[in-house]
Amino acid sequence: MAERTFGWVQEAYKISSLKRVIKLFLLNSDVNRELRFDKIPRLVSQEYGRDAFIKELSEERIHIPYQHLKGKGTPKGYTRSNAPCSGIVQAALPGQRKEYQSDWPADSFLRWGVSVGLLDYDRQSDECSLSELGEQYAHTEDGSDEEEDILKRAFLSYPPVCRIMLLLENSEPLTKFEIGEQLGFIGEAGFTSIPQHLILQGLSEISDAKERNKLLSDTEGTSDKYARTICSWLKQLGWVTQVNKTVSTILNEEEYSDTIAQSYQITLKGLRMIKHIKGISKFAKIPKRVMWDMLATKAIDRDYLRNRRTHFLNALQSDFRSLAYLQKYLEVRGISESESTIADDLSSFDNIGLSIAVKQNQYKVTDTIVGLRIPAQIQNIAKSDFSIIKDNIRRKLQYVNHKYLLLIDLGFDSDSNRDYEIQTAELLTTELAFKGARLGDTRKPDVCVYYGENGLIIDNKAYSKGYSLPMSQADEMVRYIEENKARQSSINPNQWWKIFEDTVCNFNYAFVSGEFTGGFKDRLNNICERTRVSGGAINTINLLLLAEELKSGRMSYPKCFSYFDTNDEVHIPTYRDDDYEIHRSMAAEKSVEYGSQHGVN
């Protein structure tokens, strides 16, 4: 079975371009004829499938392999700007500097069409074709009432659209960051959002308008991108309008305020759509199209999570169910889960746009769900050690927000260093009572925090195979420690140490990673010998448990700093030996997963 990710869409904006993709499946439509008689013959060579594409576009009922639609990536010897046209959707969509698009936008538009129900996708054959609604849409006149009605039905069937509309319902504008933090599955890879106060802090340090716009457009989490993409659709439909919003925050006792242009407010037309979402009075509620794929994206156990959540939704559609009932319902299907995990999934269903009613501690999905099926090839998937340990930690977090479970995923994702630093800083300064921030720039530590007289210099390291603390990075920590001692702008003009208040006089350092390997303890001792400052290493799971001890009040903040005064790895007492063995197995498992995703053997 081909690996396709339907249900979440980025970087596909224009509804008019989506219509071109839909119309290519309608024989003898203007787009279909343009492709058959002009664009495909001119833009696609025989090597990349020209004749096969023309033949597929000439069938009475058009079914086209996904790969033929999407095309190939950039071949060896080419760049993205001059890569040859190799897919039908590539040819259907004009690019900015050439007559066709690359495979990435082509894939995004296909996923968009499938996600809103205008295209059907056959998993068995890996082919796309027009849905009944898509065929109706392909026949409509641009700007007609019929077109508007079909788009309403298509977009209101897409749960994330409904989620964003409901977030905007009270007419107060929200920024893409405020929407993004409330969109997606809780504490899971694939759903990150940049804390808005970090954006405000960053904007305060930039005066150049071009650089400010670059910060706002380039600094996004995945959920922020989903929010921005979906809001671009809603703007075209007239359901929301884009506005400037002035936002303020206090960080380390300093106030930051600025205007964020990527902010959105619901319109009167949008408020009428809310009535369809809720099924109020004569406004019929539109069934929700839920793709199996959208129930998890980047998580290592995504197929297992998708199956588990599919079973949940099946159980919740028929009647109100308690957590205990859902737990037993899963057990019958060979899945063992805690009530804590089930509760997080229920909250996440609300976050993706499904309507969950609660009555006397029982839950029910009030939407009619269509399109949700577990693929035949993926009926029985075992739970990995990675998910076992994550859910074990979930049960132990009674005070810390479960969204920080995302740190466990990020600690093993070498492509997510920035997010790992940001979420570590958020855990310490927003969830807990530390002051400080992520610095994470050239010649600065990743994170610095303090409490009372005690300060901690932190280096985050996300590595798929665990982190051994090479000597070069030990040297880097030594430089930070010595710069903090000297505090001279001639040594480092950025003066990062000003993050600490003058009253902070006791310092330690910490390395934070998913897992530590090799001779890292030797390097910890080396740093101490050279600087006379002690530190420690702490893996993500122990960091979360440390946070739980602090937030619950079972541990004092001075006691917390003592853990980083040993030149050793930090182990929190609640982290049992059997947890540790599973964690080591998890690290190996995550390394294999990362290798399979990135072509590493």
Predicted regions and their residues:
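Donor-sugar nucleotide-binding helix/loop cap in glycosyltransferases
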Residues: 1-402
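Catalytic core segments in nucleotide and nucleic-acid processing enzymes
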Residues: 385-585
